[in-house]
Amino acid sequence: MSDKQATVLVVDDETRSQDALRRTLDEEFRVLTVSSADEARALLLRQPVSVILCDQRMPGLTGVEFLKEVRERWPEIVRIVISGYTDSEDIIAGVNEAGIYQYILKPWVPDHLIDTVRQAVEAQGLQGDMHRLDLELRTSTPVLRQRSSQKLASAQSAFNFERIVRAPGSPLDAVCEVAARVARYDLPVMVLGESGTGKELLARAIHYASPRAARAFVSENCAAVPDNLLESELFGHKRGAFTGAYEDHAGLFQRANGGTIFLDEIGDTSPAFQVKLLRVLQEGEVRPVGSPRWIPVDVRVIAATHCNLESDVHAGRFREDLYYRIAGVTISMPPLRERSGDLQPIAAKLLEQVAQELARPGLYFGGDALAAMMAYPWPGNIRELRNEIYRAVALSSGEEIRAQLFSRKVLHGQPGTVKRGPHVQTFPQSGTLQERLDAIEAVVLKEALLRHRWNKTHAAKELGLSRVGLRQKLLRFGLEEK
């Protein structure tokens, strides 16, 4: 992001939804809210906006109808629609009719929403420039060639292995050394690691260190998109292929032609989709949905997952032939708790970025804050650390960031009760049955609250409790956000 906060416009006729979206986003973005398409139009005429988050169900125009108008009048704005609809054809129709960047289904998850908006803001900047680089490189104008070269140099400077923050002697040194060697060769790469460890950052560094650096780098989170939409998004579709397909749509494989595609959370794809992806990788060609013709593509694939794919292959959850196709070289990103020496330089860099984005110069960590960060195991890795630093900066009144500004989970988190890897949880091995059940229940409650950023209404709904019932359990177990 730039040194200014990106502006996000929320269009929703329900005040509670507006408030929930604002609370989730306003620590990182400048959030504006309006209740109708008319109010949104008036605002867009007065000031620039980076991203629009629009609810699908509104009086008058639907969200898709309004965003279609936005696409025509303000095409530079990234458009995101939020809806409770679950029909795949409706989702695909909406995405393509209005050129929507992402479709988020209710109930949305705060961390996923924040990540989606971050990626949308980024799509306006450097990556948007890189997608236009191919065209500019083909022009004969020396000025344009020079500008394209400058953009490439800027991207290579922003996304290189040296820019991956770490301490001297970090375990990441070996990771980056292997990745730098692999980058030179046109091999598929599989990046393994927990959520928030920086897998996409490593993938970008590999791309910009490769012979494909001058061509596009595109990414897709496979876990965040329904199967039918994922097929259209990656492979494209023809006009009339399904309801709402009003024009031809080039998929991400075509956009990445000559470059690199990053497929995040590939382990969460369905067996049906895995078959289609395998065909594309084997033959080097894609067939858009509704088209009889195969289109050749030359794309390097970097995939990533938090899953143990070898176990999934043995269990029949992931195709063995696809696994060997995408895992030419496997690189593991260690979690933050296994590289504690990196925590302070990473935290310092994040604080510098947040201070710049929020116009708060001169911030620094107090000794107690550093001690608290070092004592906490960070199950959410760098993403969780970033969120905590945003929270602390937003709550701080002076230049020193103190430990008391961190959330309760950081101040009181116990290393023996956090996740050590995907789907792994440590529980008490002694005590009465009731004591053990109470310990498990407390962990389940805490994890639900963390997922929903301590929104008790959403957590209660997930757990099948009334809000009063959840409140009673929180009091019983002494769970309360500080």
Curated annotation (Swiss-Prot):
Chain positions with 4-aspartylphosphate modification: D55
GO cellular component entries: cytoplasm
Sample GO molecular function, one term: ATP binding
Main subcellular location of this protein, as a coarse class: cytoplasm
Annotated region of DNA binding: 456-475
Any GO BP annotation: regulation of DNA-templated transcription
Residue span(s) of domain Response regulatory: 7-121
Stored Pfam families: HTH_8 (PF02954), Response_reg (PF00072), Sigma54_activat (PF00158)
Domain Sigma-54 factor interaction, first and last residues per copy: 167-394
UniProt keyword list: Activator, ATP-binding, Cytoplasm, DNA-binding, Nucleotide-binding, Phosphoprotein, Plasmid, Transcription, Transcription regulation, Two-component regulatory system
Keyword DNA-binding on entry: yes
Intracellular or extracellular location(s): Cytoplasm
Superkingdom classification of source: Bacteria
Amino acids binding ATP: 193-200, 265-274
Keyword Phosphoprotein belongs to the record: yes
Task performed by this protein: Probable member of the two-component regulatory system involved in the regulation of the hydrogenase activity. HoxA is probably phosphorylated by a sensory component (which could be HoxX) and then acts in conjunction with sigma-54 as a transcriptional activator.
Protein name: Hydrogenase transcriptional regulatory protein HoxA
Gene for this chain: hoxA
